[in-house]
Amino acid sequence: MHGALSLETIEPRAVLEDDVLTDLRVEDKDRAQELIEDLMIAANRVTVRYLEARSLPSLRRILRSPDRWQRIVELAAHLGARLPPEPDAAALEAFLLTRRQADPVRFPDLSLTVVKLIGRGEYVVEGPDQKTSPGHFGLAIPAYTHSTAPNRRFPDLLTQRLLKAALAEHRAQYSLEDLNTLAQHCTEQEDNASKVERRVQKSAAALLLESKIGQRFDAIVTGASAKGTWVRILHPSTEGRVVQGF
């Protein structure tokens, strides 16, 4: 999608054979998947614009301008690039594209660092009498919502209900107070789900590597400090802190 940050994070999926974990595999994204994602973003933008044009409330998906932008500037400087002193999505995207071409193997690690520094997304309510949405920094657009996956995300279901009421010219079944409460709840539950996902991924990695103690793997050092050295094993796709080595 034009203007969106070209980030590439690794999301390994568990491979099971007869209910036994045998691998953690990263599926390569093809152009068809990228096209589907672009269409979903376009649909979300049209949905929120439709509700806004009719002065109806909407549940916005936002990503604020990063408070830790200076850390991103320092990261870019360490890699020989310059970013402006104030948050600038277009400049960050140009930097990311350059780094993807220069070092594709380590680009996912850079992307993950940038994602952490930018911060998490949130849900907020926007309505005729409540203008609070700062837009979506990662997509570089002023108005965005989630609406294309009502089967697995409650915010999408809420938006579908608001859209259905608007199309039928009925009053929305949620007041602004209701929507504000639901927006906060959805943000909190998303954070909780993300924590569980990370713990499950770490548990799966530990379970898979338990039988591989003593083996050698190709890996990339992703970080080092007084607390230790962190590496990402290329295959199976896992990462963690080195606790013993030479």
Task: Identify the function of each model-found stretch.
Residues M1-F246:
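Electropositive polyanion-binding surfaces
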